[in-house]
Swiss-Prot record:
Annotated pathway: Protein modification; protein ubiquitination
Protein name, as recorded: Tripartite motif-containing protein 5
Name of the gene encoding the protein in the UniProt record: TRIM5
InterPro entries associated with the record: B30.2/SPRY, B30.2/SPRY_sf, Butyrophylin_SPRY, ConA-like_dom_sf, SPRY_dom, TRIM/RBCC, Znf-RING_euk, Znf_B-box
Assembly behavior: Can form homodimers and homotrimers. In addition to lower-order dimerization, also exhibits a higher-order multimerization and both low- and high-order multimerizations are essential for its restriction activity. Interacts with BTBD1 and BTBD2. Interacts with PSMC4, PSMC5, PSMD7 and HSPA8/HSC70. Interacts (via B30.2/SPRY domain) with HSPA1A/B. Interacts with PSMC2, MAP3K7/TAK1, TAB2 and TAB3. Interacts with SQSTM1. Interacts with TRIM6 and TRIM34. Interacts with ULK1 (phosphorylated form), GABARAP, GABARAPL1, GABARAPL2, MAP1LC3A, MAP1LC3C and BECN1.
Length: 494
């Protein structure tokens, strides 16, 4: 019955907002009482300005000046906090669940409170046992030190949690700032830069989602980590405030839990290492895009012409060209001579379009290839055999106006050889900001020029051959070299 009365009293002095015993209780005109902190927080969220407010329970209006501290309720709460367990409940805690005897001893090896019968049992035989009063102070000091350590860890956990939230907010602000700048930069060139803007915004949005997702995960981990430490602290505080039995019962488990407490550092993302958008010179980009837009007006649908000389593998739609495996070449020749396998075989092939006048433009997809050569070739068919690695035939005087890639990163143009080495082409290393995955080729027959554009890098010019001598029809030229990944002629609609 006494327990029921205590429950009723506790309900009367419980805050309706936080559902805990009232702390610094304040009463309103309607008679309801709330914690001072809860009522203040409710004011800020419900009505931040001064004036009339309403009770969170009954909604009766009240004036802020009429709020008064309720010392009577505060005294009741204080008394309620001092109430101990009933004698019957205490007796249950003080007695061994197995033997019914009083728990007066503490086993050092098992870290358990035991009775005198437990001490004599096989389970505790030979163990060091002491009176509970003798070891209580020792464990009091241990748990007190552990509590201090956990409070420090709690502070560190809360600081880490605050840091990750601050970083999250900073990332959102920075991403929004970058997004605004991108939109402003491209506003002047909207009619020709829509595709560039879309690409940059997609990358930025992807970065935002990826980083914020990982930061959100870190934040959740930090919250869970902080909550775990709080719960352990609460358990320790309860033990330290309770009786000796409450302090020592299950102390082994609590100590193991404390030893397992480790704070995980959140994953962070230094802003100086992030991908930052760099707007190119808008005037230069405008000129580049205007030039690319102009030459794309002459886009022709190019396909390749099969022949019996080239060993290139051609797709059914006549758009993809790839290099076969060396073994296939040997089998085609009826021999598996190692000499022939090591010999560099011709995989160059012409486009089916014969060009004798006008302006012509096409694009070639070379993504994922480690080596390729492309451009234009004069004549009806490239030579069947030559040393590809030395590129002996790749010179304008031999009818080739081409550029190429080797070793995935080295981009070169091939000009006529010097006076001292006329048979070998002069290699012109090309500087490109981004290795091209897609190359545009523009041939102006009357102007005698062949230009190459890096479509991957907004269409910037890679190289231009001038004063070309077109004494006969010229054809688009592709050579996948030894890389078996195909190169693809793109359709005008792609």
């Amino acid at each position: 019955m006494a327990s029921g009365i205590l429950v009723n009293v506790k309900e009367e002095v419980t805050c309706p907002i936080c559902l805990e015993l009232l702390t610094q209780p304040l009463s309103l005109d309607c008679g309801h009482s709330f914690c001072q902190a809860c009522l203040t927080a409710n004011h800020k969220t419900s009505m931040p300005d001064e004036g009339e407010r309403s009770c969170p329970v009954c909604r009766i209006s009240y004036q802020h000046k009429n709020i008064r501290p309720n010392r009577h309720v505060a005294n009741i709460v204080e008394k309620l906090r001092e109430v101990k367990l009933s004698p019957e409940e205490g007796q249950k805690v003080d007695h061994c669940a197995r033997h019914g005897e009083k728990l007066l001893l503490f086993c050092r090896e098992d870290r358990k409170v035991i009775c005198w019968l437990c001490e004599r049992s096989q389970e505790h035989r030979g163990h060091h046992t002491f009176l509970t009063e003798e070891v209580a102070q020792e464990y009091q000091m241990k748990l007190q030190a552990a509590l201090q350590m956990l409070r420090q860890k709690q502070q560190e956990a809360e600081e880490l949690e605050a840091d990750i939230r601050e970083e999250k907010a900073s990332w959102k602000t920075q991403i929004q700032y970058d997004k605004t700048n991108i939109l402003a930069d491209f506003e002047q060139l909207r009619h020709i830069l829509d595709w560039v803007e879309s690409n940059e915004l997609q990358n930025l949005e992807k970065e935002k989602k990826d980083v914020l997702k990982r930061l959100m995960k870190s934040e959740i981990e930090m919250v869970q980590q902080t909550q775990s430490v709080r719960e352990l602290i609460s358990d320790l505080e309860h033990r330290l405030q309770g009786s000796v039995m409450e302090l020592l019962q299950g102390v082994d488990g609590i100590i193991k839990r404390m030893k397992n407490v480790t704070l995980k550092k959140p994953e962070t993302f230094p802003k100086n290492k992030r991908r930052v958008f760099r707007a190119a010179d808008l005037k230069v980009m405008l000129e580049v895009l205007r030039e690319l837009r102009d030459v794309r007006r002459y886009w022709v649908d190019v396909t390749v012409a099969p022949n019996n000389i080239s060993y290139a593998v051609i797709s059914e739609d006549m758009r993809q060209v790839s290099s076969p495996e060396p073994q296939i070449i040997c089998e085609a020749q009826g021999t598996i001579s190692q000499t022939f396998v090591n010999f560099n075989y011709c995989t160059g092939i012409l486009g089916s379009q014969s060009i004798t006048s006008g302006k012509h433009y096409w694009e070639v997809d070379v993504s994922k290839k480690s080596a390729w050569i492309l451009g234009v070739c004069a004549g009806l068919q490239p030579d069947a055999m030559y040393n590809i690695e030395q590129n002996e035939n790749y010179q304008p005087k031999c009818g080739y106006w081409v550029i190429g890639l080797e070793e995935r990163v080295k981009c070169n143009a091939f000009q006529d050889g010097s006076f001292h080495t006329p048979s070998a082409p002069f290699i012109v290393p090309l500087s490109v900001n981004i290795c091209p995955d897609r190359v545009g080729v523009f041939l102006d027959y009357e102007a005698c020029t062949v230009s190459f554009f890096n479509i991957t890098d907004h269409g910037f010019l890679i190289y231009k051959f001038s004063r070309c001598s077109f004494s006969q029809p010229v054809f688009p030229y592709l050579n996948p070299r030894k890389c078996t990944v195909p190169m693809t002629l793109c359709s005008p609609s792609s």
